[in-house]
Regions:
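Conserved active-site and cofactor/substrate-binding residues in soluble primary-metabolism enzymes
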Residues: 2-5, 35-39, 132, 188
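N-terminal pre-core extensions flanking Radical SAM catalytic domains
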Residues: 176-183
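DPxDG-like acidic metal-binding loop motif
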Residues: 32-55, 60
């Protein structure tokens, strides 16, 4: 997640001194694609008294070559480019949805040299209109996930099959890491969903709601 030496380098890049004692505890696995490494760096920066988002973005990029927008207000409401660390767009509020998922396959830590990602520029253009309804969001997220799985694997990824079998509107995956989730309208998740995920090899099962639109 963040070594002692890495923490010292991060603190220096923030204009601070590498001293003091910091304790970080995760409730997400490192390398899972759930922003644990960025969360650790943002937490360390704020504990050291640094709150300026641009300063923290630059420090995260210098530390691991990428970063999630956790240092910004409403990070879930942004289209974000993680390698250059910049906001691409602020689309309309997403509709309410319920996500059930976990982690499938090996964990994969951020590698700044890894550029094997599909082109989803067309999805960026389509995202504002898709936010008008949950089916549109789910369809766009599912196609983005398919492209990533086709390019990066694993070939036996069960997420789409599970989504179809359990009546999900779509599915989503981390472009790096092992995080995957199924998209449901709120209150429609089958009671058997967590057990089905575990039976398919998912770990650290999670369930949460997001979105604030209609």
């Amino acid at each position: 997640m963040l070594s002692r030496a890495g923490a010292a380098v991060l603190l220096r890049s923030l204009g601070g001194r590498p001293e003091g004692r910091f304790s970080l505890r995760l409730d997400m696995p490192a390398g899972g694609g759930a922003a644990a490494s960025t969360a650790a760096r943002v937490a360390l920066a704020r504990a050291a008294g640094v709150t300026d988002p641009k300063t923290i973005v630059l420090a995260c990029l210098g530390s691991e070559g990428a970063g999630d927008p956790l240092m910004l207000d409403d990070p879930g409401g942004l289209l974000w480019a993680s390698r250059p660390g910049r906001v691409l767009a602020r689309p309309p509020a997403r509709p309410r949805m319920e996500i059930v998922g976990g982690f499938f396959g090996p964990m994969r830590r951020t590698d700044p040299r890894d550029a094997a990602f599909p082109d989803i520029a067309d999805h960026s253009d389509a995202w504002p209109a898709a936010c008008g309804d949950l089916a549109g969001v789910a369809a766009l997220a599912s196609e983005s996930a398919r492209r990533t799985i086709r390019l990066r694997g694993p070939a036996d990824d069960p997420t789409e099959t599970l989504a179809a079998a359990k009546g999900a509107l779509g599915f989503v995956i981390a472009h790096t890491g092992a995080a995957r989730g199924l998209i449901f309208a709120p209150g429609t998740v089958p009671e058997t969903m967590p057990a089905a995920l575990r039976a398919s090899g998912f770990r650290h099962i999670l369930r949460f709601r997001i979105g604030g639109g209609r």
